[in-house]
Amino acid sequence: MSAILPGYAELHCQSNFSFLQGASHPEELVTRAGELGYAALALTDECSLAGVVRAHVEAREQKLPLIIGSSFTLQAGADAPPLDLTLLAQNREGYGNLAELITLGRGRAAKGQYLLTPADIEAPAGDNAHLRGMPDCLAILAPPPGLAAERLAEQARWLAAQCPGRAWIGLTLLHHCRDDLHRAAVEHAAHASGLPIVALGQAQMHRRSRKPLHDTLAAIRTGRSVGQCGYDLAANAERHLRSRLRLASLYPAQALAQTLAIARRCTFSLDELQYEYPDEIVPAGHTPASYLRQQTYLGARQRFPEGMTPAVAAQVEKELALINELRYEAYFLTVYDIVGYARSQGILCQGRGSAANSAVCYCLGITAVDPARGNTLFERFISKERNEPPDIDVDFEHQRREEVIQYIYEKYGRQRAALTAVVISYRPRSVLRDTGRALGVDNGIIDAVARAHQWWDGKKEMLRSLAACGLDPASRVARQWAELAETLMGFPRHLSQHPGGFVISRGKLSRLVPIENAAMPGRSVVQWDKDDLDALRLLKVDVLALGMLSVLRRALALAGQRRGRPLALHEIPPDDDATYDMICAADTIGVFQIESRAQMSMLPRLRPRQYYDLVVQVAIVRPGPIQGGMVHPYLRRRQGREDITYPGPAVRKALARTLGVPIFQEQVMQIAVDAAGFTPGEADALRRSMAAWRRKGGVDKFRAQLVGGLLARNYTADFAQALFRQIEGFGEYGFPESHAASFALLAYASSWLKCHEPEAFLAALLNSQPMGFYAPAQLVQDARRHGVRVLPADVLYSGWEASLQDAPGAARPAVRLGLNLVKGLREDSARAIEQARVRRPFADTADMARRAGLPRQALDALAAADALRTLAGHRRLASWQAAASAQSRDLLREAVIVETETPALPAPSEGQTVAADYRSVGLTLGRHPLALLRPQLAARNFQTAAVLNTYPNRRLARACGIVTVRQRPQTAKGTIFVTLEDETGPINAVVRPELIERQRRELLDATLLGIYGTWQSVDGVRHLVAQRLVDLSSLLGQLSQDGLAAASRNFH
């Protein structure tokens, strides 16, 4: 049957990258087109190429010709209807023109929108003149049903004139009552213009079963429920990829034949894209290769003042030779230039990831990991066999990274540099809110359901939870809601900007990939994400933000001021016993990487005592080692409870530093090379295939090669199979040793500062917010438990940021909180206070308000935060004086402060003060809220953290505290880890899945949570395994009628 049906190529197809229009993924459309025997498929998302790389990768696997195109609605003016146009790239030149047209339209409009007119094709101006008539693109007029015949004829004549010999008029038949009228109008226009007619499906779904989702997307797009959409919904499900039999029964044979004629003319493939990195940073008289060599050896003199060892020198030469062979010199030099700029501006930066395997990167100052200090594996970074570009990630201070980004824009221009996109996809709460509104569900129920689904366990689990949220799980709307939510989960919602992945080109970047405006002013993004760039082997440089680098620079500066001399990062003693004692005790709140619950649980068991131990510590608390079953064997061997054994000498070479247990990706690769006969490039291909294993499978060939190679070298079958299972456990979650080594440097530096300069460290943490795992309230409480004196924000002493303040007779300074913690206070108001205070002290609130020119809002915020206490007294008095002192904003007359007598107002209670602290500053320096509630909690037998820490293993216990952190790691099989805080410290709790389902609302909604359970204390790791949860948030109302505004950090 298939052989006698007319051939067909779908030339107008929109995926879900036509956001809230297409109801199928690009891959689904490609796969379905192949199943239906289409000759080709054109992906034509609206003014976008965001989905084409995904379609390209799938089409390559399906061996289906993919046509690259895009659809547009050209705004023809108030008196004319819009013109719907589809453009298809014939060749590389046509593709570049198409990408530039998309860039032009997107650049004129706000993020997520575009604006193009017929004039942009008929007579484009200036630098876009070459786009006139869209050379090397085929054009199809795609009129909507209902367009008047004469209007359509006019549009057809215009298109025929603009694209002679390259234009068609599309006929779309959707089994609609207007099909005959539409066909007549199209035939009339074709006759009037001389354009041939081509069949178009205008598909937006791969199967008709997506029609309910298609309707839901229309409702979301228009902000109404499905029931209110009426004619905005498609009349039927015909906008799917239809069978050739169905198409043959609807369309004239000639219209179907034209689809094949057009497909034959479109020969362009994304594989043709060639990317050239900029080379202007190479000075005259040098080639990129000679300049890279010169700078590498100049850097080596600084890195190795006593000279490189023969092994390092050989490694440098090996790397330079491979970089030259693959022609990556300009890429390395570009990153080198960016890092050099940052350092010239005093911005801390450090390379990480696989780049830390490179001796060249170390010599250039891009990375900080000495290749002579670890087991680096350059093939993890660059491999000739892999034939994929290297990826250099560089972290910069998060508060100054924008300076680096603007340097790149200024150096290369916005036509040659743009950020990589990130596809923002539907997640549980956004899915449930949008689909719930589309179905007309009550807003109260939607909010309750969304709050109860911080993660997604599938529609069955959703239905089980609906009853507690006020909806019958057996109702039709509940079943529809669950079905739609599961289908929409993971759909792209819009494009955002990557944290810092830059694409920089030698020529015009918009001819390689379309560029559009970002939401943030001064930023532009390409329409592809990092996976798209990787799939096409396009280079990018990651200019990433890392809060801890900001902390380190600030803390070193503050510590240097206290010591009377500058303190640099490299001056931190490398093997400080006190620092490692603190780390082994899991006293790591606020430090880098080892502050999470999982890391803190591991520290007392692994007990790091040197730098490489920290490298292992950073890497071992990852899904890869955990899923691969490597954690417990390593710990048993480290603690002397299990013998260290190796299956053979070749394996010993790779695993000696980790006690015979593979922890790092490089070790997996090294075993494949040393013990199974892989080349280094094949070994990295094995690692990368494991990253895709969970998504696509396809590692059987590596299984055979690895197991066969090991058996051929006399390793046992049991070992070979066990090793492969461990490798599978890594998946995409294993840490490269080079990455862990980079992070371990920062983990140690931050730990040393916390141990020896706790005041500077706390101030730096507060001044670098938002960042890290803990909120300022927890950071301050932890510092105070360690003896750090913290003083409140005060207009007489505080600057915008936290600072160190000496006190007479005190051995160490106190930390004075900054005005940046005051909610509702702008920085310019705080700076004005500082400047006015320098001239002379303030006499009173009115004097401060007048001299600093403060608006009423700023005065109210300062009063609420108790920052006027030394000028005005307690909060109530301060609020009265703030109102009396507010300057008139009338610019026509001089501001006058009216003298009024302050009434005798009672001071707020201690509970009211604490509650007001949390509302206005986010923390309190008074007694902890639970200290005030301790009598009530003691009456219910809730114990403090200090008491619980004395309990033996397996004792029944009760704990209560303010929820500060909720976590649900991927490897925990649905378990949630909760951190509570009381007046004596943190309490770690474990909540199992069966309890979560019974008490989801208490777990997710409570601010003050009581937990009944069993205390566990093993090897210095202590936590409470929950058996029952109680929401005690109502007790906080005893402090203040507004409760306590204590925020937790959830599911980071």
Swiss-Prot record:
* Primary location class: cytoplasm
What is an annotated GO biological process for this record, any one? DNA repair
Q: Which SMART domains match?
A: POLIIIAc (SM00481)
Q: Tell where it localizes.
A: Cytoplasm
Q: Which GO terms describe its molecular function?
A: 3'-5' exonuclease activity; DNA-directed DNA polymerase activity; nucleic acid binding
What family is it from? Answer: Belongs to the DNA polymerase type-C family. DnaE2 subfamily.
**Could you say which EC number(s) this protein's record lists?**
2.7.7.7
Top class in the EC scheme: transferase
Q: Which organism is it from?
A: Bordetella bronchiseptica (strain ATCC BAA-588 / NCTC 13252 / RB50) (Alcaligenes bronchisepticus)
Keyword annotations of the record: Cytoplasm, DNA damage, DNA repair, DNA replication, DNA-directed DNA polymerase, Nucleotidyltransferase, Transferase
- Sum up the protein's function in the record's words: DNA polymerase involved in damage-induced mutagenesis and translesion synthesis (TLS). It is not the major replicative DNA polymerase.
Keyword Ribosomal protein on entry: no
Listed GO CC annotations: cytoplasm
Give the protein's recorded name.
Answer: Error-prone DNA polymerase
Show the catalytic activity: DNA(n) + a 2'-deoxyribonucleoside 5'-triphosphate = DNA(n+1) + diphosphate
Q: Could you confirm whether the keyword Amino-acid biosynthesis appears in this record? A: no
InterPro entries assigned to the protein according to its UniProt record, in alphabetical order: DNA_pol3_alpha_NTPase_dom, DNA_pol3_finger, DnaE2, DnaE2/DnaE/PolC, DNAPol_HHH, NA-bd_OB_tRNA, PHP_dom, Pol/His_phosphatase_N
